[in-house]
Amino acid sequence: MAWSNQSAVTEFILRGLSSSLELQIFYFLFFSIVYAATVLGNLLIVVTIASEPHLHSPMYFLLGNLSFIDMSLASFATPKMIADFLREHKAISFEGCMTQMFFLHLLGGAEIVLLISMSFDRYVAICKPLHYLTIMSRRMCVGLVILSWIVGIFHALSQLAFTVNLPFCGPNEVDSFFCDLPLVIKLACVDTYILGVFMISTSGMIALVCFILLVISYTIILVTVRQRSSGGSSKALSTCSAHFTVVTLFFGPCTFIYVWPFTNFPIDKVLSVFYTIYTPLLNPVIYTVRNKDVKYSMRKLSSHIFKSRKTDHTP
């Protein structure tokens, strides 16, 4: 069936997280702090990795790109959500809604591929250490990053190819703080069951399969690491544990939401907040709290910046 976009709906109303005025003021302050911390934390990782020569390795190159994606993922909807806490009319245009969904799936798809790439990097480093630099060459790392963005773009376009032409004639209330595909297609004036099945197969099941494969991959890596007792193995165990935590935090909410798109659970809003805001905030903490190299480089960078400012202000 071909649909033409003769929608009566020109904008969508975002119901947000709460209708309580007191809670909205609290959310405004809370999420403003969280968003600022997310951007600054991920930006600090990107700058630290770019400026420190001893961090110019495949693992940190991929980590820097992950931080950039996380920073972008936290920015596609959060600034508008924060501003909407102070607005009575929480609306978004049809084009703005489609744009939000495009960037959500672009960044989500890119992050999935990048997390798989980071898993592959750890597998090669631990299971094939003698061939690590040969396999994880600069060309390979750049190729993996480019591949992640290509997959993200194609995934986003595949999700919107049919959605953008659906007729929307009311109601126009989206029960979330941003436009998410499962919620938006429910508002269409036609039966979207087939589109929902397509969404399950391209988003939900892919996320679930990738998550299972990553769990198996990290299990193999951790078993290999546990068989060793050297200091290097202890460091590898710490690194892989951090990677596995990030994978779980990202894939858990995504899988739950997109495997059951026909059912709207009360916890869906919480999960949406988790993988679009909290996970990008926690990733810098998870990757740096037990990583001595990154913490040392951050202290060195901060000290250099502080000394430069002090010198500039000295008469």
Curated annotation (Swiss-Prot):
Pfam families: 7tm_4. InterPro entries: GPCR_Rhodpsn (IPR000276), GPCR_Rhodpsn_7TM (IPR017452), Olfact_rcpt (IPR000725), Olfactory_Receptors (IPR050427). Glycans are attached at residue 5. Its main location: membrane. The keyword NAD does not apply. PANTHER family: OLFACTORY RECEPTOR. Odorant receptor. This is Olfactory receptor 4K3.
